[in-house]
Amino acid sequence: MTKFIFVTGGVVSSIGKGIVAASLGRLLKSRGYSVSILKLDPYINIDPGTMSPFQHGEVFVTQDGAETDLDLGHYERFTDTSMSRLNCVTTGSIYQAVINKERRGDYNGGTVQVIPHITNEIKERILRVAKSTNPSVVITEIGGTVGDIESLPFLEAIRQFRKEVGRQHVLYMHVTLVPWIASAGEMKTKPTQHSVKELRSIGIQPDILVCRSDRPLPKGLKQKLSGFCDVPEECVITSQDAKSIYEVPLNLEREGMAEQVLNLLQMEQRQPDLTQWQTLVQRLHTPKHELEIAIVGKYVQLSDAYLSVVEALNHAAISTYGKLRLRWVNSEDLENESAETHLGGVDGVVVPGGFGVRGVDGKIAAIKYARDRQIPFLGLCLGMQCSVIEWARNIGGLTDANSAEFDPHTTNPVINLLPGQQEVVDLGGTMRLGLYPCRVLPDTLAFKLYQEDVIYERHRHRYEFNNAYRDLLLKSGYAISGTSPDGQLVEIVELPKHPFFLACQFHPEFQSRPSSPHPLFKGFIQAAIALSLSTSTTPTPLEVS
């Protein structure tokens, strides 16, 4: 039978529950167990798809087209397992489902209440994940902090869950903060004690305490927490701050977390195989090259808005023994100041996705700078659209070229709405979302990187390359290297005579893994390293037959 682990958080938000859940998933998978990880988010939005990146960070898109919390990216990257729309549940989606059932008459005229109707729906969503892929373990992260009113229905549901599926099949893990108070010269356990007290008042006794701190917990302090929180000493786990999130699974393995989890759930103890992960961390700490990459975006004030892009760059850099430094560039700054001021000296430029006209001219200026200066360039989604506009304006002779998104009345809409999008009114869940095939054309940089005729990538967009301008741009030297299987949708463009200039309509960052960096990011980083090592101001272009 599937086992269930529930991860809650206390004391402060953003304490790292998602990384703990993902790390535990990795440790279990290294022992041969299959894992699925579920996020229960307490906000009332149906999904994060329409939420501001400044508030919520990036929207992570699953293969089946769900717009989900960024933590699902951590789950996929750490466990190397693709999640689905079943793995992200919000309060809004729960209430929507219950209200729809009430409208259909499913409750036979009964009074619809938080208990049992909302809690039953939550439990059903958890069981649905277990039934869908039949994993050995389902790990469920409860968003928010214990004590928040928004989380109460979720906590009540997981309290009931243990009784219904059996105590031996359920484990509660509580992630909390043990701060170091410099003025006192000691670590304080009181916040954790109060957090556990709050959790116990709801009816949940944690089986394992994961204590986030900036230093190891002394044995005496673990004994103290064990006594006050009624948790065995060996189940008080230190989660010490790390320079990289990829160190966390190894740190938790040294603390014996997986061993205790298997003991408590009465599962077979198996020898872990973490060789691949250890190699990853070893490469992380022994770089041979240093390079600086500029990310030119609209939401750079919150780096989480581009989390998967950053991680994909890290994966590629680690695989090539590169030490990555990021230069965050607000695209709006490039509209009033020279590109040289903000991009001078970088080894590569990434223009990621986004929506709306704000800052677009700055993105276009960054792309022109990278093209003119022969600096490796990678455009993602909106980044591809901006690269098409830049080329059309400056090389194709269409000085007023634009996207219909930015100027609905432009005379040269080189980027236009996808077919079927003209009548769409709602914003949420209505774009081209999820995994789609792409035909990679031979004798192109894209084919050299992928080494495959057909690839599958995740999409999240409403606008596309306008085929009315295809011949014009091709004649001016622009190259199309990837299309939909029917050839109608342009998916990848590139410049053959540039060291590395490639842009794609999809989001390759969602498919990158620490153990298998995405080919586009790896090729981009290799080109950036070549530039950083070059003594010439004009690097030699990559050869494409």
Curated annotation (Swiss-Prot):
Gene Ontology terms, MF aspect: ATP binding; CTP synthase activity; glutaminase activity; identical protein binding; metal ion binding
Key word Membrane present: no
Role description: Catalyzes the ATP-dependent amination of UTP to CTP with either L-glutamine or ammonia as the source of nitrogen. Regulates intracellular CTP levels through interactions with the four ribonucleotide triphosphates.
Keyword annotations: ATP-binding, Glutamine amidotransferase, Ligase, Magnesium, Metal-binding, Nucleotide-binding, Pyrimidine biosynthesis
Annotated residues for binding of ATP: S14, I15, G16, K17, G18, I19, D71
Gene3D superfamilies: 3.40.50.880, P-loop containing nucleotide triphosphate hydrolases
Binding site for CTP: S13, D148, I149, E150, K188, T189, K190, P191, T192, Q193, K224
Assembly information from the UniProt record: Homotetramer.
UniProt-listed GO biological process terms: 'de novo' CTP biosynthetic process; pyrimidine nucleobase biosynthetic process
Regulation of its function: Allosterically activated by GTP, when glutamine is the substrate; GTP has no effect on the reaction when ammonia is the substrate. The allosteric effector GTP functions by stabilizing the protein conformation that binds the tetrahedral intermediate(s) formed during glutamine hydrolysis. Inhibited by the product CTP, via allosteric rather than competitive inhibition.
Residues bound to UTP: S13, K188, T189, K190, P191, T192, Q193, K224
Note, other: CTPSs have evolved a hybrid strategy for distinguishing between UTP and CTP. The overlapping regions of the product feedback inhibitory and substrate sites recognize a common feature in both compounds, the triphosphate moiety. To differentiate isosteric substrate and product pyrimidine rings, an additional pocket far from the expected kinase/ligase catalytic site, specifically recognizes the cytosine and ribose portions of the product inhibitor.
Gene Ontology terms: cellular component: cytosol
Binding sites annotated in the UniProt record for Mg(2+): D71, E141
Position of the signal peptide: none
Residue span, Glutamine amidotransferase type-1 domain: 292-534
Region entry Amidoligase domain, spans: 1-267
Name of the top EC class for this enzyme: ligase
The name this protein goes by in its record: CTP synthase
Pfam families linked: CTP_synth_N, GATase
Stored HAMAP family: PyrG
PANTHER family for the chain: CTP SYNTHASE, CTP SYNTHASE-RELATED
Encoding gene (name): pyrG
Binding of L-glutamine, residues: G354, L382, G383, M384, Q385, E405, R462
Active site: C381, H507, E509
EC number: 6.3.4.2
